[in-house]
A protein has these predicted regions:
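Long, charged, low-complexity intrinsically disordered regions
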Residues: 2-7, 93-103
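N-terminal, positively charged regions that mediate nucleic acid binding
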Residues: 21-32
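Flexible glycine-/small-residue-rich
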Residues: 29, 40, 70, 83-85
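Short aromatic-glycine-enriched beta-strand elements
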Residues: 33-38
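Short, structured beta-strand/loop micro-motifs enriched in basic residues and often containing a Trp
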Residues: 42-52
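Short nucleic-acid-contacting surface segments enriched for D/E, G, S/T with interspersed K/R
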Residues: 54-67
Length: 103
């Protein structure tokens, strides 16, 4: 059996939680050119753009849990990926009731 991943206090402090406008989702397909198809918790599939701050620093894979900020226009179809959660952060989100989707 593997070791249980323990979430440290500084990882919780650095973690970005969803606000009223943001939605959690699962990265379904990588489309290239910094675009990802994301299935969001509100039932919509959005074509999301990886924002410039994350492009080369954070690599998103299929099945990752991400935080999406829908655009002001075309909010049901488009959005920006603003955060990717690590595995232990996803477990914390599930325990606290933020995440109901299965990856």
């Amino acid at each position: 059996m593997g070791k249980k991943k323990i979430l440290s206090e500084e990882e919780i402090a650095d973690m970005v939680l969803p606000t009223a406008n943001d939605v959690l989702g699962v990265a379904m397909r990588l489309l290239g050119f910094d675009r990802v198809l994301v299935k969001c918790q509100d039932g919509h599939e959005r074509l999301c753009r990886i924002r410039g701050k994350m492009k080369r620093r954070v690599w998103i894979r299929q099945g990752d849990i991400v935080l999406v900020s829908p655009w002001d226009f075309q909010s049901d179809k488009r959005g920006d990926v603003i955060w990717r959660y690590k595995r232990n952060q996803v477990e914390w989100l599930r325990r606290k009731g933020y995440l109901t989707l299965q990856a």
